[in-house]
Amino acid sequence: MRVFFKTYGCQMNLNDTETMAGILSQHGYEVVNLPEEADIVILNTCVVRQKSQEKYHSALGQFVKLKKSGKIKLIGIAGCGSNLEGEELIKSGADFVIGSRSIGKIAEVLQKAARGEKIVYLEDDICTVDSKTPRMRFSKHHAWITIIHGCNRFCTYCIVPYTRGREKSRPLPDVLLEVEKLAKNGVKEITFLGQNVDAYGKDLKDGTNLASLIEQAGKFEQIKRIWFLTSYPTDITDKLIETVAEDPKAAKSFHIPVQSGSNRILRLMNRRYDRDQFLQLVEKIRSKIPHASISSDIIVGFPTETEYDYMQTMDLVRKARFERLNLAVYSPRQGTVASKYFKDDVPREEKVQRLNKLLELQKQINRELNMQYLGKVVEIIVEGKTKEGLYYGRDIRNKVIIFSSQEVSEGENVLLKIDKITAGPLYGKLQKKCGL
């Protein structure tokens, strides 16, 4: 039977889809790229925002219609939506629901669904997913590697601890076995993933940590670049900063969500730091790694956010000068502390206005930061082509650079001279191909 996956949300969901696709492929299923080619559709869902939840519900409705017309046979739901909604998704037309920590059992669940059973399987079987688990990688040169599942932080706005569970790290030897396997298969870039990736190893209580993992993963000659995300500010250690600074294979890039620049709002969010501590962390990273790229996330319109709170956020963005900034308006998530106890009292129009002002500020900062690239030669790893047929890739600071060429290969290292900047990607001219 043929299976189509539609994936929503974060990189961990992408990695989970790769895992489920690999397991099903090993069990004789054919993974296809188009839903019209499939007998089975699996939606790997995200509920971090209301909009993402609405998207997969809309898709579920469309696929239910296709099933009634006989064009598909089964519909499955995976990801965070499974843990949040469970049986309700069966009532909405799904044939099976599998939890985010249950994906190692996807073949067994699908077999039961194929026999006509309506299945909701939400058990914590995440230990069954390890270096031996087959994965269908969607990139030839880059691989996602989930090293820690779940989150213990319980920020008041966030649904993740309720849908992904508590933190559970993979043993370091098992992660390194996966890295070794990838290196042998020609992968040259890896990204270590976790909702709170810097907490990696704490629960193992054997000294394992992210810094030591990066150091050991870099010993594989084929691996040329190592990324990690997402970071929680107070879990970034001096040792991690030193490792990123000194290890030539470690990408000089940190993604550190700040969420607000107001100390009052940070306390309401249960973020365990204040604005000064965050800015001191940014300064520390840049003092050790002068050209480090630091990106962040911000939520605008959190309950009770005043104009003063918002201006504090604007001020923090001016001082931090992020390379990139992911912005979102606050939306209550079912089951979180904020949805239970805080009234969503900032008008939608005000939220959007605040977001747009922050977006304009960040664009201005981006243009200013990007000016330093003009005329410089940088090395990137080619990732693919744009819709316009141009090639693109990233440098070691996570800067996207677009260029034209007669022919280069995905995963190839090339040197580019930057001749055009924007508030987003840079543009360059090919100077030299450095090979695969």
Curated annotation (Swiss-Prot):
<feature type="binding site">
    <location>
        <position position="46"/>
    </location>
    <ligand>
        <name>[4Fe-4S] cluster 1</name>
    </ligand>
</feature>
<dbReference type="GO" id="GO:0005829">
    <property type="term" value="C:cytosol"/>
</dbReference>
<dbReference type="InterPro" id="IPR006638">
    <property type="entry name" value="Elp3/MiaA/NifB-like_rSAM"/>
</dbReference>
<keyword id="KW-0949">S-adenosyl-L-methionine</keyword>
<feature type="domain" description="TRAM">
    <location>
        <begin position="371"/>
        <end position="432"/>
    </location>
</feature>
<dbReference type="Pfam" id="PF01938">
    <property type="entry name" value="TRAM"/>
</dbReference>
<comment type="similarity">
    <text>Belongs to the methylthiotransferase family. MiaB subfamily.</text>
</comment>
<feature type="domain" description="Radical SAM core">
    <location>
        <begin position="137"/>
        <end position="368"/>
    </location>
</feature>
<keyword id="KW-0808">Transferase</keyword>
<dbReference type="InterPro" id="IPR006463">
    <property type="entry name" value="MiaB_methiolase"/>
</dbReference>
<keyword id="KW-0408">Iron</keyword>
<keyword id="KW-0479">Metal-binding</keyword>
<dbReference type="InterPro" id="IPR038135">
    <property type="entry name" value="Methylthiotransferase_N_sf"/>
</dbReference>
<dbReference type="InterPro" id="IPR023404">
    <property type="entry name" value="rSAM_horseshoe"/>
</dbReference>
<dbReference type="InterPro" id="IPR002792">
    <property type="entry name" value="TRAM_dom"/>
</dbReference>
<keyword id="KW-0004">4Fe-4S</keyword>
<dbReference type="GO" id="GO:0046872">
    <property type="term" value="F:metal ion binding"/>
</dbReference>
<feature type="binding site">
    <location>
        <position position="151"/>
    </location>
    <ligand>
        <name>[4Fe-4S] cluster 2</name>
    </ligand>
</feature>
<feature type="domain" description="MTTase N-terminal">
    <location>
        <begin position="1"/>
        <end position="115"/>
    </location>
</feature>
<feature type="binding site">
    <location>
        <position position="80"/>
    </location>
    <ligand>
        <name>[4Fe-4S] cluster 1</name>
    </ligand>
</feature>
<dbReference type="InterPro" id="IPR013848">
    <property type="entry name" value="Methylthiotransferase_N"/>
</dbReference>
<dbReference type="InterPro" id="IPR007197">
    <property type="entry name" value="rSAM"/>
</dbReference>
<dbReference type="Pfam" id="PF04055">
    <property type="entry name" value="Radical_SAM"/>
</dbReference>
<feature type="binding site">
    <location>
        <position position="158"/>
    </location>
    <ligand>
        <name>[4Fe-4S] cluster 2</name>
    </ligand>
</feature>
<keyword id="KW-0411">Iron-sulfur</keyword>
<dbReference type="InterPro" id="IPR005839">
    <property type="entry name" value="Methylthiotransferase"/>
</dbReference>
<comment type="function">
    <text>Catalyzes the methylthiolation of N6-(dimethylallyl)adenosine (i(6)A), leading to the formation of 2-methylthio-N6-(dimethylallyl)adenosine (ms(2)i(6)A) at position 37 in tRNAs that read codons beginning with uridine.</text>
</comment>
<keyword id="KW-0963">Cytoplasm</keyword>
<protein>
    <recommendedName>
        <fullName>tRNA-2-methylthio-N(6)-dimethylallyladenosine synthase</fullName>
        <ecNumber>2.8.4.3</ecNumber>
    </recommendedName>
</protein>
<dbReference type="InterPro" id="IPR020612">
    <property type="entry name" value="Methylthiotransferase_CS"/>
</dbReference>
<feature type="binding site">
    <location>
        <position position="155"/>
    </location>
    <ligand>
        <name>[4Fe-4S] cluster 2</name>
    </ligand>
</feature>
<dbReference type="GO" id="GO:0035597">
    <property type="term" value="F:N6-isopentenyladenosine methylthiotransferase activity"/>
</dbReference>
<dbReference type="Pfam" id="PF00919">
    <property type="entry name" value="UPF0004"/>
</dbReference>
<keyword id="KW-0819">tRNA processing</keyword>
<comment type="subunit">
    <text>Monomer.</text>
</comment>
<dbReference type="GO" id="GO:0051539">
    <property type="term" value="F:4 iron, 4 sulfur cluster binding"/>
</dbReference>
<feature type="binding site">
    <location>
        <position position="10"/>
    </location>
    <ligand>
        <name>[4Fe-4S] cluster 1</name>
    </ligand>
</feature>
